[in-house]
Amino acid sequence: MILTTAVFSGHKTLYGPFGIAGFAKKKGIALEPIIFGGTGVDSANQGMPDILPYRYEAGSQNIQAVAGLHAALTWLADKTDIMDVEKANHRKLLQILGRHSNIHIVGPKNRENCIGVVSCVFDGYSPNNMGDVFDELEIAVRTGLECAPLAHKTLGTFPAGTVRFSVGYFTKENDFEALEQALTYIEENS
């Protein structure tokens, strides 16, 4: 596959802060701005300047997030084991979830090329109710439609959504132990 454009969020897998994203495009691909004004480069022009990158930078830049993403990317550049650690943590999460018959993983069966995010549904409970339970047990999860209602329509989990677990480079053994204890508690008290 030949990429012509790529869009990314700074806080997903790149370990940057919320509030920053980016895109790259192949030369010759014309993109029209969707937000206008405030470039400080050609202020008399009501449109956006033709000069890159200013054409796509309306308003003040989120300098703190830019610095945070830069720091994250610098840190990532020195990590040679990050993919191995994340894949191992993803496998461990799948093993733990798979031990509980009341949990059904949503998504592809072959998860070898997936990142450490796993969406589930629980027998007899809505995702929002499960989120409240996990909150009481001090386990951080996302619940509901997770900013992706069309994905949930495709997966058949709309309108309730799922419970989403995430693991990454910083997930440690005590996190997995706490999750296993929480899931066992939930299963025994259902």
Q: Where in this protein do the model-derived segments appear?
A:
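Pyridoxal 5′-phosphate
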Residues: 1-190
